[in-house]
Amino acid sequence: MQYPKVLLLGEPFNDYSGMGITLTNLFHDWPKENIAVASYNLDVSLCEKIRPCAQYVPLGGASFSQSFATRRSYRRKGLKSTLRACLGRLYSKLGLSDLRHIPVTSSLLDCIESFCPDIILSALGSLDRIRFCEEVLQYAPDSKLALYVVDDWPNTKFNGRFCQWWWRKKYDVAYKRILAKADVCMSICQYMSDAYMVQYGVQFYPFHNPVEVAKWDAIEKMRKYEEGVFSVLYVGKINRDTQQPLKDLCDAVTELNRNGEKVIFDVYSPNVKHNIDLSKYKGCNIFSQVPNAEIPKLMKSYDALFLTLGFSEISRKYVRLSMPTKLTEYLVSGIPILLYCPEEIALSKYVSEYGAAVVCNQPDKRVLQQSLLNMIHSDEYNDCIVSRARDLSLRHDVQIVRERFRKTLSSVV
């Protein structure tokens, strides 16, 4: 079985980010000696634990703009923090991060020379990373280029900037230039592949995060709460795409509890302290994120799983072709899904096409409340949803997806 030597450029293997989890799952079977990583924010000890590699090359820490974002999240009120926040927003609006030059370090050149990658795989993500990838290719003339895109950043990264029209043109020209150099392109879902074929005339092979169906089936359901209580779980980040939808469900749960229902909504998130306060909602709780390995057991202890993406114009544009990493885990969990998101985005289309979730496409708390009420009082309805979701999850089984991924990369060597 052929496993080409792959240098992963720009993204690390990890167990906490969508990209890191997906890449870890896709490359799970790769021999250690055939995979190397050159990445930002590289945690070698974590890689060694979950996805060992032949070589590791750190490319640096967080960018200037990312450091501003981090400081804003944890800032104290005061003149200095206010000025820092204003400067950070100005930095983002000017798009200064895209003007950076990312150097090709001697350690990276040594890796390319000694490892001799058959393929350099990059997710890119910005203009400066496109230029960096192009420069790296000059030092690896015999390596093939594989691109993997999971968000529609080529069409949205510049939203909100000054001279947006100028940045749009810059991104379009640069992305088309790197696409012309690519030997194989991959996307996060078929909807993105179809859209990019129309826009760029390039075939993108879809690869979503695979799931170990057998592993999930072996986990028994153990209720967290007593009989008679309908429990709902959300696991994930709290950001501009999810904050308002989470509050909408909290309002719906609070109203149902006031009307005599017994409903609990639990949120597990890595950023619980800084983005949302659930103390005013009845039956709603927020907890720190649990280790990734404990999530399957946690999911199977609830009556419903809440999955959402935002309804704002900014969110709609950014996530229109995206597919959440955790979707496959939701599908295989055996727990009915309550999906709350715009109708036109890829996630809604995919799940609705197969009837794999209770779908609420209107940003209306009353409609969301009624959808939840239907789930509370109809086991037959929930069982039907679960059955369809499981059938859909089989398409994403690790054995199928990993082999297709291996063949796709091997085909260009």
Set out the residue ranges of the language-model regions:
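N-terminal subdomain of nucleotide-sugar transferases
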Residues: 1-69, 204, 212, 253-259
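Membrane-proximal helix-turn-helix segments that form the acceptor-binding/catalytic region
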Residues: 26, 110, 128-131, 135, ...
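A conserved catalytic-core segment of Leloir-type glycosyltransferases
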Residues: 44-101
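Carbohydrate-associated surface elements
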Residues: 191, 209-210
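Conserved catalytic-core segment of nucleotide-activated headgroup transferases in glycan assembly
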Residues: 212-218, 224-279, 288-293
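Nucleotide-sugar-dependent
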Residues: 241-244, 293-295, 305-328, 337-349
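Conserved active-site histidine-acidic residue motif and adjacent donor-binding/catalytic loop
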Residues: 269-273, 284-302, 310, 363
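A charged, aromatic-enriched C-terminal amphipathic alpha-helix characteristic of glycosyltransferases
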Residues: 363, 367, 379-410
